[in-house]
Amino acid sequence: MKKKISIMLCIVLFALTGCTNSGSTIRFGAADVGGMYYSFANTFTELANEQGYDFTCKVRTTAGSNANIRLLSDDYIEIGIAQADLIADAYKTNEDLRAIAGLYTETCQLVVRADSDIQTLDDLSGHTVSIGAKESGTKRNATQILEFAGMPSSLVATKNLDYIEATKELKAGDIDAFFCTAGLTTTV
């Protein structure tokens, strides 16, 4: 992963050359601590700060993709990680946004306990499901999937939890399933 981040670092730092004042801070919007976005952003900023440039990089925890896009538009962060589908949609309304590189392919997955009776989307009816944190890409994906499957909110009780909270609540039996938009190798 460090090799990929080093290459990305070169690209981003080249793109930012001349965009920052001496001694300034570049704020990197990640997501929740413990996730892949945060891990990537943390490694990226550590490598960037080791280079001795006239600026420093700092990670900002956020709710995820949607939040990062909003925070970029609000000038709260200078770099952010977001899902490709959300970036494409955001670009339609804000042409000042730029994508630097794709990091990895993400899929939206539905996570249940091994002993769960939930086998299909239809089985979610009458259950409690986390659809992701409020400004996350997962929330958007989960909402789209449930709408496409014809599952109105009257049939499924939803909660807005990040992956860490959702995992704890699933183990405790407080929710029955949760959506997770992440790389295939992500551990939850």
Predicted regions span which residues?
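Sec-dependent signal peptide recognition
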Residues: 2-10
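Structural recognition of the beta-strand scaffold that forms the well-ordered cores
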Residues: 58-59, 78-83, 109-111, 130-132, ...
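A ligand-binding cleft/hinge motif common to bilobed small-molecule-binding domains
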Residues: 73, 81-93, 143, 147-149, ...
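A structural signal for short loop-to-beta-strand junctions that line the ligand-binding cleft
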Residues: 95-103
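Short helices/loops that flank or line small-molecule/ion binding pockets
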Residues: 42, 65-77, 164-178, 183
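C-terminal motif of bacterial Sec signal peptides marking the signal peptidase cleavage site
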Residues: 15-18
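Bilobed "Venus flytrap"/periplasmic-binding protein-like clamshell domains
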Residues: 23-51, 55, 106-172
